[in-house]
């Protein structure tokens, strides 16, 4: 099965899922890194990472 997405080349379903998995893992890694940065701060954590 081939899927066409606006602004990108035609790709097979396996490539579409692979890129989605890459995006998900990249966002998870970035989130874990932000959490580690927050937990490694001395004193009271700042709210730079929080959308509060």
Curated annotation (Swiss-Prot):
Family classification: Belongs to the lambda phage CIII protein family.
Annotated function: Presence of the CIII protein in the cell results in the stabilization of the CII transcriptional activator (a very unstable protein), CII activates CI, the gene for repressor, and thus promotes the establishment of lysogeny.
PROSITE patterns the record matches: LAMBDA_PHAGE_CIII (PS00553)
Keywords assigned: Activator, Early protein, Transcription, Transcription regulation
Record's protein name: Regulatory protein C3
One Pfam family matching this protein: Lambda_CIII
């Amino acid at each position: 099965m081939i899927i066409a997405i606006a602004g990108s080349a035609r790709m097979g379903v396996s490539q579409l899922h692979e890129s989605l998995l890459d995006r998900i893992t990249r966002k998870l890694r970035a989130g874990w890194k932000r959490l580690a940065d927050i937990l490694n701060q001395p004193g009271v954590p700042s709210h730079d990472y929080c959308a509060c």
